[in-house]
Each structure stands twice: as structure tokens, then as C-alpha cells.
Amino acid sequence: MSPDGASWSINTFDRGGKATVSFVGSDRSDLNPRRILSLWGNTNLSDPRIHFTEDSLSVTHIPLDAFFKLGLYSKTGMAVFENKQQRLTLSFEAPPIESLCDHGCNFELYMCSRFLELEPLGARTDIAPGQCASHWEDWYLEPV
């Protein structure tokens, strides 16, 4: 039997700035739960750095002592980070929820006082000796 795992990239950004990730559901008329949000134990949803809109989650990097981590499923597979007059758009896979580790999340976000991480996750896969696994992400950098 092959090990079961998933590829995961950690993109680390300097303090300051704001990250926004799409959090759109599949169909607003669908009455089943389709918007996944996973919280690590120390995450406090009343943290002033976290902001929800109808279609997205935004976090503003403010160097507070408390750190947090959360994950979600982004159907559009897109996150944006703006800092120092630059905008980085990060596009990544949106595989079926059932194929993902970490409770169906394809994107995780970690913040501490010194930096912020944007973390796309690939689909769960079996990997045999001599094989490889990967996921894709595209970066697009532009001035703001």
C-alpha cells in the first residue's frame, strides 16, 4: 500500500499588507453546506485582523502577539496579497472537496506578528516509491 498524502506550498510574506481569498459557495440556491471553514485551536473569529464579506475572507497583517491559522475551500482558487505598493495574485487548484486533506480545505492562511503565510493545498494522492506528486499555483505580480 502506498502512503497517502498531499502537496502543500507555504508562501511567506513580510509584515504589513492585506490578503484576500475568495470564499464563494457553489450555488446560492443550494441549501446544503458547501462553504468550508476550518479553524486551528488558537484562532479567534473576533480577532480584529479577520474580516468576512459575502464572498471572501480578508486578513490585515497587524503585528499582534496572538497568531492564528484557518483554512477554507476556495472554489475559484484565487488569493490576493497587497503590500508595499504591490499586488500578488495567487491562482491555485480547486480539486473536489472530497479529495482534500485538512477537512476539505484547499487553502490555509497563517499569521503571526512577523509574517503572513498563504498556503495552497493539493489533492490527496497515493505515492509509491519512485513516483512524485505535485500541485500547481501561478503568481502574478503587479504594482498598485
Where are these regions (language model features)?
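A contiguous, surface-exposed recognition patch within enzymatic or periplasmic domains that forms
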Residues: 1-132
